[in-house]
Amino acid sequence: AKGRADLVVNTDNRRIVFEFKYAKNETEAKTKLSEAVEQIKTRDYGNILPKKAELIRIAAVFNADPKVRAFTEFQLV
C-alpha cells in the first residue's frame, strides 16, 4: 500500500496534497523536508481517482524549537 497524505483538499478542479513533518530544530527541519518530498514522490500522493485538472503537492515542516514554533520549510513537489 502506498499510504495516504496527511491532508488532501479537493475543489472542483484542483487537488492540493500536504505532507507534514515535525522537527525539533532548524537543522532537523532541512532533513525532514527532504523526507517529506521523497515520501510524496515515492508514494505518488494525489494521483487518485477522480483525477483533477490541477494537482498541487506541498511538503511542509513544523519547527518545534521554542523560539520558532512555526512552519519554516516548504516545497512544492
Kindly give the residue locations of the regions a language model identified.
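Structural signature of nuclease core domains in nucleic-acid processing machines
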Residues: 1-77
